[in-house]
């Protein structure tokens, strides 16, 4: 398991993890590798929903500047991968509070007042309740995303 080629969102350490992991897998005789990614299309949709909620006065947790910054970052091609490229989608809503706590614990990566941590619980779960993966050895080619990382 390594990050996608862009490191999820262009993070240089994550890009290096991808390079080293893929190289190791190849040197070890072609060990299967899965890439952890973010669903660029799902994140963009979540931002669009937040913009609409903010405009209607519902998203009191967000502000216009924050939303515009998020939108700009999600438009970059090095941010995650397109839904059509993602081969696996695993529901993690059963552990969503632990996921949020883990993100919060990475203070060097995510500020306490970040867009992600400011979301209400329901919005956070809808946005981050799925973990996304790519099996680079098996392009999706229109198939439904699998929810089983080991067998499919």
Q: Which positions does each model-derived feature cover?
A:
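Metal-dependent de-N-acetylase/amidase catalytic core
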Residues: 1-152
